[in-house]
């Protein structure tokens, strides 16, 4: 909903700040206007060490998202805001207008027409221990591990002008390190559990290699005892299962065992573990 718009007003410590909320429509207009102004002074994309800074593409991407939300059922003539303390115009647009969907489409097209963003598709490992090895879905992996703030060193920039960054409109990148692995990795790989783990319901959403749901593919029959076989390549780059091979402490052949019982490790967990 709407918030107090301060604009370029500068307050001193003892000044009374504006606290009255502006309407939802005014807030949308303010965000869009500011992004349009900023986009005129920013490059479409950055590269190298400047990856992660705001760009014209990021401004247009934010406008696109704002316009999509604005046109959605939640804000476009919603039923929220029926009390005098919270009038509708603070929560969204009081009346539905289908032209807001046209504005959302146009905003999305503005991003597409930049011709700088694409799905980074590469099925050959570019670096690491096995450069040149066939690995379906390697491009999906590269998006999350390109921490050198440069282009993936595989000549991909010939096809993708900014390497694996071609898929990112606006990202926040930490420096090199193992923060992500510590949050989400298995305990034997240095994981601390603070980031949480994937749920089985989400695991089941990954299709088979032919795009069909598990249990519906004739070419890739699903075996619950071997859940990773025949799955979409993104499965192996997202999910850790019993028998996964993951880099750990320089060991590229480290095997993760999640089973309980004889020989179980700190990676083991029981049924129903959240």
Residue spans of the language-model regions?
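Aromatic- and Gly/Pro-rich amphipathic surface segment
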Residues: 268-272
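Aromatic-anchored glycine-rich loop motif in surface-exposed flexible loops
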Residues: 1-56, 65-96, 274
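An aromatic- and glycine-enriched ligand-binding surface/loop that stacks and positions planar moieties
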Residues: 36, 53, 57-60, 67-267
């Amino acid at each position: 909903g709407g918030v107090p718009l301060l604009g370029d007003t500068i307050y001193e410590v003892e000044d009374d700040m504006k606290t009255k909320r502006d309407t939802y429509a005014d807030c949308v207009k303010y965000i869009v206007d500011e992004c349009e102004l900023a986009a005129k002074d920013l490059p479409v994309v950055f590269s190298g060490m400047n990856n992660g800074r705001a760009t014209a593409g990021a401004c247009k991407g934010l406008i696109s998202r704002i316009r999509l939300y604005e046109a959605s059922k939640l804000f476009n003539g919603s039923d929220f805001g029926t009390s005098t303390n919270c009038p509708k115009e603070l929560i969204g647009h009081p009346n539905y207008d289908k032209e807001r969907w046209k504005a959302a489409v146009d905003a999305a097209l503005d991003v597409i027409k930049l011709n700088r963003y694409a799905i980074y598709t590469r099925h050959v490992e570019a670096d690491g221990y096995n450069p040149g090895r066939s690995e379906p879905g390697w491009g999906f992996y590269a998006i999350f591990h390109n921490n050198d703030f440069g282009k993936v060193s595989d000549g991909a920039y010939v096809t993708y002008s900014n390497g694996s960054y071609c898929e990112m409109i606006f990202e926040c990148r930490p420096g090199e390190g193992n923060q992500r692995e510590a949050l989400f990795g298995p305990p034997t790989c240095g994981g601390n559990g603070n980031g949480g783990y994937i749920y089985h319901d989400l695991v089941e959403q990954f299709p088979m290699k032919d795009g069909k749901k598990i249990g519906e593919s004739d070419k890739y029959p699903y075996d619950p005892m071997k859940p990773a076989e025949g799955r979409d390549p993104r499965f192996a780059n997202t999910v850790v299962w019993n028998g996964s091979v993951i880099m750990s402490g320089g060991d590229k052949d480290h095997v993760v065992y999640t089973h309980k019982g004889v020989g179980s490790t700190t990676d083991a967990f029981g049924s129903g573990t959240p």
